[in-house]
């Protein structure tokens, strides 16, 4: 009887540890927005790969930035904000500086995760809503992987939509999926680095 209880206790502890993620380290993550940022919470997870598309790359520095839910980079949310203002009208920061930004380093398995809001498209322009990435380090020169776009955006060129199937795990158009019963969504986005 004691042996059976010991085995059950060991199995329960192993299952509990696995459920809490202790069997596999968690990727470094960064939160780009405060809890009161207007918009839909978006969690992006992915892995950075070497040019072969198979080997994860540890130690890559990712710099990420995106517009707010209304498509502006720099202006703070305001109900009085006029959407006809130039998108780079940033009174408290240098021009073209994104307010929603951050950086992180990929873990030993090349993984990363960040929390932001789903960006809006630029006002008065025909660009799809997107998130920018810059990758550097780990022996690679600084490079700009494809922007992450969102399925259903009418401004994504038809050719980009058509070629997604060919890209496999390196698709750059994601279809955000709900997380539990809340309003948050998540996307997977993998990056293939260019040659050194």
Positions of predicted regions on the chain:
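Bacterial N-terminal signal peptides
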Residues: 6-15
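Beta-strand-dominated extracellular/periplasmic modules and repeats
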Residues: 20-196
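Positively charged n-region of N-terminal signal peptides that target proteins for export
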Residues: 1-5
């Amino acid at each position: 009887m004691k042996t059976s209880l010991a085995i059950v206790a060991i199995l329960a502890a192993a299952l509990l540890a696995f459920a809490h993620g202790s069997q596999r380290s968690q990727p470094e993550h960064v939160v780009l927005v405060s809890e009161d940022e207007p918009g839909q919470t978006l969690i992006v997870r992915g892995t950075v790969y070497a040019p072969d598309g198979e080997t994860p790359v540890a130690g890559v520095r990712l710099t990420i930035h995106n517009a707010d839910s209304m498509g502006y980079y720099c202006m703070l949310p305001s109900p009085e904000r006029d959407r006809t203002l130039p998108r780079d009208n940033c009174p408290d920061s240098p021009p073209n500086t994104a307010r929603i930004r951050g950086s992180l380093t990929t873990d030993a398995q090349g993984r990363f995760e960040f929390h932001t809001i789903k960006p809006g498209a630029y006002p008065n322009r025909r660009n799809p809503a997107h998130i920018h990435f810059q990758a550097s380090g780990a022996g690679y020169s600084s490079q700009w992987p494809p922007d992450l776009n969102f399925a259903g955006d009418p401004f994504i060129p038809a050719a980009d939509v058509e070629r997604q199937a060919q890209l496999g795990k390196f698709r750059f158009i994601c279809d955000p999926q709900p997380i539990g019963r809340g309003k948050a969504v998540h996307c997977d986005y993998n990056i293939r680095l260019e040659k050194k």
